[in-house]
Design a protein with these regions (language model features):
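Conserved active-site alpha-helix within GNAT-family acetyltransferase domains
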Residues: 14-25, 110
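Conserved short beta-strand elements that form part of the metal-binding/catalytic scaffold
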Residues: 28-61, 66, 110-115
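Short beta->alpha transition motifs characteristic of CBS
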Residues: 7-10, 95, 102, 113-117
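N-terminal beta-strand motif that seeds the catalytic metal site of vicinal oxygen chelate
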Residues: 1-18, 63
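Vicinal oxygen chelate
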Residues: 63-110
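Short glycine-enriched loop/turn motifs at secondary-structure junctions
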Residues: 1-3, 55-60, 95
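Conserved acetyl-CoA-binding loop of GNAT-fold acetyltransferases
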Residues: 24-29, 83-85
């Protein structure tokens, strides 16, 4: 039986990736296996693998992070912490009944945060 899905995301520079997710997004670094990282925030878990040839400006990697409550507070906290919101990713209600905002990590991965309206 499948318990949950855990995304595996690429990184170019481990230090920049850890600093971004831990210092800016408030994730916890759970494990560091050299070229493989595991981080978590609340019930979300992300795995990261080294991908030296990745071009952030051409990355097609993206994930959707479901927010259970207070997406406005999370959005405001990230802005206060200096997290750059994607120019097309300001907090807004979408036609698919989700309130969303988006950011791009240092590796070019699009992170969309969403909560049902």
């Amino acid at each position: 039986m499948i318990a949950r899905v855990v995304p595996k995301l690429p990184y170019i520079n481990k230090e920049h990736t850890v600093n971004f997710y831990v210092d800016k997004l408030r994730f916890t670094l759970q494990s560091d296996y050299g070229d493989y990282l595991i981080m978590s925030l609340d019930s979300a878990e992300l795995h990261f693998f080294s991908y030296p040839g990745l071009k952030p400006e051409k990355s097609d990697f993206m994930i959707y992070l479901r927010v259970e409550e207070n997406i406005e507070g999370l959005y405001q906290q990230y802005q206060k912490d200096g997290v750059a919101i994607h120019p097309n990713g300001k907090l807004e209600d979408k036609p698919w009944n989700q309130r969303e905002f988006a950011i791009i990590d240092p590796n070019g991965t699009l992170l969309t945060f969403g909560q049902p309206c």
